[in-house]
């Protein structure tokens, strides 16, 4: 089984280079000032210049306005990951304004009822990202996981990715339970919030390659 990978929240040339070297399919940049992983569009542009074309560049946003999306897109992004309370109407507006950009919608999952929102984004988002629900200001990147068994028999309305509490030690179990074909990691390759560890990035990507 071929599982694709996204390393999210990168902010240095060294960690970007490591993610590329070990085969990440997507690299994510956070454009949310309250996050310890936040970068400016200017910083993202500098980092994106070292990423080859075959690696997709995702921007992570929380209820962004179009001005921020435009500035971030100019850095070289290929996709928007929306991690806030964006409604279906708002996503439709973003798609109309940025028709060539891939759109992912993150869903916060704590129980089976939370999956009921997934079909609302059919025809609007290109992909759903299932992440663990958090209680604080930050909508993701907290190292929390939800009960993966919720996805075991679920009929997904869209292509999807798994996130939340993943690391090199549990990724095999996570994929075995959920059947995920795309996995997204942030805090699981950090030594502290916002500080990525190159060894952990390499170990995670190598672990996925062995699946």
Curated annotation (Swiss-Prot):
Any one of the GO BP annotations: L-tryptophan biosynthetic process
Catalytic reactions on record: N-(5-phospho-beta-D-ribosyl)anthranilate = 1-(2-carboxyphenylamino)-1-deoxy-D-ribulose 5-phosphate
Top-rank lineage group of the source organism: Bacteria
Pfam families in UniProt: PRAI
UniProt entry tagged with the keyword Isomerase: yes
Pathway annotation from the record: Amino-acid biosynthesis; L-tryptophan biosynthesis; L-tryptophan from chorismate: step 3/5
Enzyme class: isomerase
GO molecular function, one term: phosphoribosylanthranilate isomerase activity
SUPFAM superfamilies recorded: Ribulose-phoshate binding barrel
Annotated EC: 5.3.1.24
Gene3D superfamilies noted in UniProt: Aldolase class I
Keyword line: Amino-acid biosynthesis, Aromatic amino acid biosynthesis, Isomerase, Tryptophan biosynthesis
Annotated family: Belongs to the TrpF family.
Protein name: N-(5'-phosphoribosyl)anthranilate isomerase
Species for this entry: Zymomonas mobilis subsp. mobilis (strain ATCC 31821 / ZM4 / CP4)
């Amino acid at each position: 089984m071929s599982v694709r990978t996204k390393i999210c929240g990168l902010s240095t040339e060294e960690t970007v280079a490591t993610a590329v070297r070990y085969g990440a399919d997507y690299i994510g940049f956070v454009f949310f000032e309250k996050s310890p992983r936040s970068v400016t569009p200017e910083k993202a542009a500098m980092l994106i210049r070292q990423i080859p074309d075959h690696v997709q560049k995702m921007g992570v946003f929380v209820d962004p306005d179009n001005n921020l999306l435009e500035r971030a897109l100019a850095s070289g992004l290929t996709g928007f990951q929306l991690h806030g309370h964006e409604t279906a109407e708002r996503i439709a507006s973003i798609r109309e304004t940025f028709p060539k950009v891939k759109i992912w919608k993150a869903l916060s999952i704590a129980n089976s009822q939370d999956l009921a929102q997934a079909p609302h984004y059919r025809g609007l988002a290109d992909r759903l990202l299932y992440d663990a629900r958090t209680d604080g200001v930050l909508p993701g990147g907290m190292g929390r996981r939800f009960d993966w068994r919720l996805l075991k028999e679920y009929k997904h309305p869209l292509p999807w990715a798994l996130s939340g509490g993943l690391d090199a030690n549990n990724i095999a179990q996570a994929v075995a339970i959920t059947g995920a074909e795309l996995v997204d990691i942030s805090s699981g390759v950090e030594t502290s919030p916002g500080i990525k560890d190159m060894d952990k990035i390499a170990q995670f990507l190598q672990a996925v390659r062995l699946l």
